[in-house]
From Swiss-Prot:
Gene Ontology molecular function, alphabetical: DNA binding
InterPro entries membership: Arc_rbn_hlx_hlx, Ribbon_hlx_hlx, SeqA, SeqA_DNA-bd_C, SeqA_DNA-bd_C_sf, SeqA_N
Pfam families: SeqA (PF03925), SeqA_N (PF17206)
Protein name: Negative modulator of initiation of replication
Family, per entry: Belongs to the SeqA family.
HAMAP family: SeqA
Primary role: Negative regulator of replication initiation, which contributes to regulation of DNA replication and ensures that replication initiation occurs exactly once per chromosome per cell cycle. Binds to pairs of hemimethylated GATC sequences in the oriC region, thus preventing assembly of replication proteins and re-initiation at newly replicated origins. Repression is relieved when the region becomes fully methylated.
Record's subunit section: Homodimer. Polymerizes to form helical filaments.
Cellular component GO terms held in the UniProt record: cytoplasm
Keyword set includes Cell inner membrane: no
Gene Ontology BP terms: negative regulation of DNA-templated DNA replication initiation; regulation of DNA-templated transcription
Length: 179
């Protein structure tokens, strides 16, 4: 196994391409580069270098999402406006936050209540913290969230999540007010 250093933006892009919990960076890169592990040809190893530094000058530009623009677009979208239930708006907001920045979302989901775990990477973890938590999978993400709380608590959860993801207070207020 070799170690390489990558810029933060490239790291976030690679982390954002994760399809399942536990997928290694090598697996993600193989999938993205369409490299089949069986068809690799052994290459003579050079022992001297201890690591490879990859810089952003390589010319690779990862897909970037403007978080503020994405969230504002969500709030004015027909899809969001058509949702009548707070739980549906809550789930769409969570899914969008994950799409914008999967790595920050993952770090921010460490939010916990005094007695409850709000987010987990599997249903069993949430059920272990209470049989009445009504866990639901967050669409297009590997995460689960508890849903048997009132709208005020859902707003607090989104507020904490967005704060940890470094969104501005004004936008956080607009998003939480729309749930």
């Amino acid at each position: 196994m070799k170690t390489i250093e990558v810029d933060e933006d490239l790291y976030r892009f690679i982390a954002g391409q994760t399809e399942r919990i536990g997928e290694s960076a090598s697996d993600i890169l193989r999938r993205l580069l369409l490299v089949d592990n069986q068809g690799t040809v052994p290459i003579e190893e050079i022992v001297e270098p201890k690591g490879i530094v990859v810089s952003k000058e390589v010319g690779f530009t990862p897909e970037k999402f403007d978080g503020v623009k994405e969230m504002r677009s969500l709030l004015i979208s027909d899809e969001f406006a058509s949702l009548k239930k707070a739980i549906d708006r809550f789930m769409l907001v969570l899914s969008t936050l994950h799409k914008i920045d999967p790595l920050s979302f993952s770090e921010a989901t460490q939010v916990k209540g005094r007695k409850r775990v709000y987010f987990a990477d599997n249903e069993a973890t949430l059920l272990a913290n209470g049989n009445t938590t009504k866990p639901k999978a967050i669409p297009q993400s590997p995460f689960w969230v508890i849903t048997n709380n009132n709208t005020s608590r859902k707003r607090q959860m989104v507020e904490q999540l967005m704060s940890r993801m470094n969104f501005q207070a004004e936008l956080i207020e607009k998003v939480t007010g729309s749930i």
